[in-house]
Amino acid sequence: MSEFAPICIYLVISLLVCLIPLGVPFLFASNGSTYPEKLSAYECGFDPFGDARSRFDIRFYLVSILFIIFDLEVTFFFPWAVSLNKIDLFGFWSMMVFLLILTIGFLYEWKKGALDWE
């Protein structure tokens, strides 16, 4: 059991670090009485408690998906660039094929007009 003691201590401390911030607001929170200013409209005229399910343009979704895809591409390039002097020709050309596939995908998105904001 002594070999598992550090793991158990780590788990207890991590649970406390997670649960204490969740429990502290219950100790210091007010009764739920709200001020009328909190329920009034903002300076811009929006109600603070409106419908959260408002419609948004699908182009925002497409741009975010493209950002995630090309951001993941960059995360693949960092380890490849660090180990470039240790990998052989196969590693180099496999990354070039990966880059070519992503470039073709990017050009396809561009040709279809997913990046045009009209």
From Swiss-Prot:
<comment type="similarity">
    <text>Belongs to the complex I subunit 3 family.</text>
</comment>
<dbReference type="GO" id="GO:0030964">
    <property type="term" value="C:NADH dehydrogenase complex"/>
</dbReference>
<dbReference type="GO" id="GO:0008137">
    <property type="term" value="F:NADH dehydrogenase (ubiquinone) activity"/>
</dbReference>
<keyword id="KW-1278">Translocase</keyword>
<keyword id="KW-0679">Respiratory chain</keyword>
<keyword id="KW-0249">Electron transport</keyword>
<comment type="function">
    <text>Core subunit of the mitochondrial membrane respiratory chain NADH dehydrogenase (Complex I) that is believed to belong to the minimal assembly required for catalysis. Complex I functions in the transfer of electrons from NADH to the respiratory chain. The immediate electron acceptor for the enzyme is believed to be ubiquinone.</text>
</comment>
<keyword id="KW-0813">Transport</keyword>
<dbReference type="GO" id="GO:0031966">
    <property type="term" value="C:mitochondrial membrane"/>
</dbReference>
<feature type="transmembrane region" description="Helical">
    <location>
        <begin position="9"/>
        <end position="29"/>
    </location>
</feature>
<feature type="transmembrane region" description="Helical">
    <location>
        <begin position="62"/>
        <end position="82"/>
    </location>
</feature>
<keyword id="KW-0472">Membrane</keyword>
<keyword id="KW-0496">Mitochondrion</keyword>
<keyword id="KW-1133">Transmembrane helix</keyword>
<keyword id="KW-0520">NAD</keyword>
<keyword id="KW-0830">Ubiquinone</keyword>
<keyword id="KW-0812">Transmembrane</keyword>
<protein>
    <recommendedName>
        <fullName>NADH-ubiquinone oxidoreductase chain 3</fullName>
        <ecNumber>7.1.1.2</ecNumber>
    </recommendedName>
</protein>
<feature type="transmembrane region" description="Helical">
    <location>
        <begin position="87"/>
        <end position="107"/>
    </location>
</feature>
<dbReference type="InterPro" id="IPR038430">
    <property type="entry name" value="NDAH_ubi_oxred_su3_sf"/>
</dbReference>
<dbReference type="InterPro" id="IPR023043">
    <property type="entry name" value="NAD(P)H_OxRDtase_bac/plastid"/>
</dbReference>
<dbReference type="InterPro" id="IPR000440">
    <property type="entry name" value="NADH_UbQ/plastoQ_OxRdtase_su3"/>
</dbReference>
<dbReference type="Pfam" id="PF00507">
    <property type="entry name" value="Oxidored_q4"/>
</dbReference>
